[in-house]
Regions:
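Short, well-ordered beta-strand elements
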Residues: 1-6, 54-57, 80-83, 130-132, ...
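Aromatic- and charge-enriched surface segment that lines or borders ligand/interaction sites
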Residues: 45-96, 131
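Short, solvent-exposed loop/turn elements at domain surfaces
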Residues: 5-12, 37-39, 65-66, 140-143, ...
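Extracytoplasmic/secreted proteins, especially bacterial periplasmic and envelope-associated proteins
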Residues: 20-24, 33, 37, 41, ...
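N-terminal lobe/hinge region of extracytoplasmic solute-binding protein
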Residues: 1-50, 92, 171-178
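Sec-exported extracytoplasmic/periplasmic mature domains
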Residues: 30, 34, 61-64, 85-93, ...
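Gly/Pro-rich hinge or "lid" segments in bacterial periplasmic/extracellular proteins
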Residues: 117-119, 127-128, 133-189
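Short Gly/aromatic-enriched secondary-structure transition segments
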Residues: 11-21, 71-80, 145-151
Length: 189
């Protein structure tokens, strides 16, 4: 890694060092394989409606959040709902939100025309079923689900980080293959 990441918050990260680390710390609904194919991430299976506007995901019950301080919680559909709500909330100022404007009501929420985040086309049915509704079909949408902005966000963990989510070892959770044990901020060591 050439330099310290600016943030390990998937919804706000924009630099190469951050997105490289996020790919190891977080697991999204789908994964991008080295050959360019998509495989299961947190989603064990998914279906797409005939019109290409509705994606339904069945999530694994064995994906957990962890961190260097012993945080342990199951990753649920609500974590994806909250992550997408943060992505489009104007207060977040997510630099890549526009890439996901195919999601129902996302553009209107991001612009402030709709203030009710629950109107976003991302909903949970219980802990392990997630539905994403689109405004228009987007053949690239499954690929977008492998990118940093589409990663889940534990609302409990986010609130407990008190505005420092993804900015230190102690405020960066993981639901991926690795978690952050140390973060050396000195570029000369």
């Amino acid at each position: 890694i050439a330099y310290n990441p600016g943030s390990l918050d998937p919804q706000t990260a924009s630099d190469d060092s951050s997105t490289l680390l996020i790919a190891s710390l977080y697991t999204g609904l789908l994964r991008l394989e080295p050959d360019g194919s998509l495989s299961a991430g947190v989603a064990e299976d998914y279906t797409v409606s005939d019109d290409g506007l509705t994606y339904r995901f069945k999530l694994s019950s064995s994906n957990y959040w962890t961190d260097a301080n012993g945080f342990d919680s199951v990753c649920t559909a609500q974590d994806f709902v909250f992550g997408f709500q943060r992505l489009f909330d104007p207060a977040t100022r997510a630099p890549r939100a526009s890439e996901y404007f195919c999601i129902k009501n996302s553009r209107a929420i991001n612009s402030g025309a709709i203030s009710d985040l629950s109107r976003l086309g991302v909903t949970a049915s219980g802990n392990y079923e997630l539905t994403i509704e689109l405004e228009y079909p987007d053949p690239n949408f499954p690929m977008l689900l492998t990118e940093a902005p589409a990663m889940p966000c534990s609302e409990e963990y986010f609130i407990s980080s008190q505005g420092r989510y993804g900015l230190s070892r102690d405020t960066t959770p993981s639901n991926g293959a690795f978690y952050l044990r140390t973060w050396n901020y000195d570029p000369y060591t």
